[in-house]
Amino acid sequence: MQDQNNSNTPKKKKLSFWGIIGIVASILVLLVIAYIIYYYVSQTTVLKRDFSFLNRAIQEAAKSATDDIYFKSIVDNPYNNSLVATMQLPENVWAALNGMTSTSTRIRVVTFEVHATTSMKNILYNEIISSIGGATPSFSRGLAMILGYSENGVTKAGEFLSTGAPTESIWSTVLRYGTNIIFLLLFAASFIFMFMSFRSQRGTGGLLDNKSVAQRIYSNKKFSDIAGNEEVKEEVKELVDYLKNPKKYSTAGARIPKGILLGGPPGTGKTLIAKATAGEANVPFFFISASNFVEMFVGLGAKRVRDMFEEARKTAPAIIFIDELDAVGRSRGAGIGGGNDEREQTLNQLLVEMDGIKENSGILIMAATNRSDVLDPALLRPGRFDRTITVGLPDIKEREAILKLHAKGKRIANNVSFMMIARRTPGFSGAQLENVINEASLLSVRENTNVITLPQLDEAIDRVMAGPAKKSRTISEKENAAVAYHEAGHAVVGIKIKGGNKVQKITIIPRGHAGGYNLMMPEEEKYNRSKAELIAIITSFMGGRVAEAIIYGKDNVSTGASDDIAKATRIARKMVTEWGLSELGPIKYEEDTDNPFLGRDYMKNASFSAQVGQEIDQEIRKIILAAEANAHKIISENRELLELIKDALIINETIVAEEIEYIAKNMKLPPAITKTKEDLHEEYSDQDFDNLFNEVSGKKIISEDKYVDDLNKEIKQLEEKIEANKSSSKSTVNEEKSKDEKNN
């Protein structure tokens, strides 16, 4: 019973170091406040006067035949060169001494202080002494000094005093030494804080202890929580099975991989796979970010690596997961700060622990990185990271599975097709797809709908890709029409050209830095593309610029095509320099990796001469100009389709693939858009309405083509220039060959 009572008794909390510091600081603050209050309360108000004022006052006292003007005391303070006089006198005399007038004879007592140096005091004393016949009284006979100055023999002085050496009050002592004490306490607190923080770096693994900085976590994730990445899951499942049943593999004489490296773009689920591994394996799982190894102190990173592996060996079988491995695993000797820095020392220790003298049986090392290309080769060799698995972006079926997984527990409208959403999200990572579902859920709550609708999912896709719509931006009808023509040009080329990107959605609502937004996707996902398909894609990109040139002329083309030009140029350059799809032949002039997260070279390998560089530029220009000419031909032959899609954008601001297909098939606006157009007619006059939609009495007017079609001429000139360069190169080679023959 006693034990029970004791167990229920609340334990007294020990006073921490910071609690003591807080109490001491509070006491010091209270003392300072008390001193300030005491100082101001104890201060007496003393009038300040000059030395001549004191002389006049003494003379007035000497001239008076009565005791109405009387010095109660004069205090000499030699330590601050002052005289403090206290006297009684009538109001009118006090006023006269201060240069004022008064008729009152009421007696008052005043105290005033005058500044007087030693020489000034001596003058005053000498005058007083001379007035009593030259006799020099002792200091204790100070009464006679003023008494002798009286002409009528009337007593005019009380005491003449001299202050002793000043004594320091307790408050002055506290104020003088308190600042030093506070400074010392703050210094000690800072030192102890640094010491304690280093001992408990991020909770564990400090300077002086042997605790590992790696966190031992318990995950509730399973492989069933991961959609897609089936091949990766199969690889990891094998490792988990080994940790659960090691005898099965040892009997077969198999050595399980010591390490597995997960690489790939961000958001593809590398860390999620590690969490699922921890949840499935049911063994100790140690998680650490590679950036936690390197700190400001030399040797701390290597120590943390040793501590982490030592703790894992004690609990084997175990899994160690290092996230963002490139923070510590970059190739040695490539740093600007020199080869023997703290990061490289940490990497060396990691290499030793993974495959060194000590055995790591029963320990599986997993790591994730977005930059596997920059890792040290010694880290990637067999025996350390035996397997390198690329966790890539999901394909259309995997995107559908990921969307369904994240949609569990959410109310989705019946007409929503996840396959259609997956088709509209090419290149999306798993994290982006999860964000799409979450954004749609937030829109559903904002719009107060019971279920997540298809328009909300479409808007969520747009928000993830290009940011929220800027609906409040004021755009003139003229600029709005120009944007509509631009986006309609992309759509027309995409519809009519074979192998090009098809438009899935168009909007003229500004998003991000763009005035409009066009979702263009290939008809089907492919890993390889032919030259014709690439040229068709470039032609689709040029459709917007060409449409503007046809309607407004080449001199009035806007800057809205900058992104299209950049994409088209990038594809054309790769066709010439990497893929061998030009007249220069199958030669690789430059090296650039499609996926920057699997290898990005900021300084491209350009191993060619200036003349070859000129030929490359000419080939790129030739491809772009040919695509632009083809886009002009397609749009010129489909001007009415261009106008209809432009009208649909002006009316609805956003149209999707189904509406675009309806317009292309029936050469008229869908019924819903037609009705909106009729309602819109009521807001405009007939003339303004016709000008907006290029109509007269409901019939389309196809304006004059303002595009200057000199592209074919430019292409011909380019071809002639290329041929001239080839002839020049051939003659140069022949001359060098003949010289060599002569020399031989």
From Swiss-Prot:
Chain residue ranges for the region called Disordered:
722-744
- Where is this protein localized, as stated in its record? Cell membrane
Gene Ontology BP annotations:
protein catabolic process; proteolysis
- One MF term from GO for this chain? metalloendopeptidase activity
**Which parts of the sequence lie on the Cytoplasmic side of the lipid bilayer?**
1-16, 199-744
Recorded GO CC terms: plasma membrane
- Positions of the catalytic residues: 487
Q: Which SMART domains match?
A: AAA (SM00382)
Q: Where are the transmembrane segments?
A: 17-37, 178-198
Q: Can you tell me which residues bind ATP?
A: 264-271
* Extracellular topological intervals: 38-177
List all Basic and acidic residues biased stretches: 733-744
Residue positions binding Zn(2+): 486, 490, 564
CDD domains in the record:
RecA-like_FtsH
Looking at the keywords, is Transport present? no
- Please give the cofactor(s) recorded in the UniProt entry for this protein: Zn(2+)
Q: Does the keyword Amino-acid biosynthesis apply?
A: no
How does this chain sit within the bilayer?
A: Multi-pass membrane protein
The entry's free-text remark on the cofactor is: Binds 1 zinc ion per subunit.
The EC number on file is 3.4.24.-
Superkingdom of source: Bacteria
**Enzyme group, top EC level?**
hydrolase
Q: What's the subunit arrangement here?
A: Homohexamer.
- HAMAP family in UniProt: FtsH
UniProt protein name: ATP-dependent zinc metalloprotease FtsH
- According to its UniProt entry, this protein's organism is Metamycoplasma arthritidis (strain 158L3-1)
Q: What is the lineage of its organism?
A: Bacteria, Bacillati, Mycoplasmatota, Mycoplasmoidales, Metamycoplasmataceae
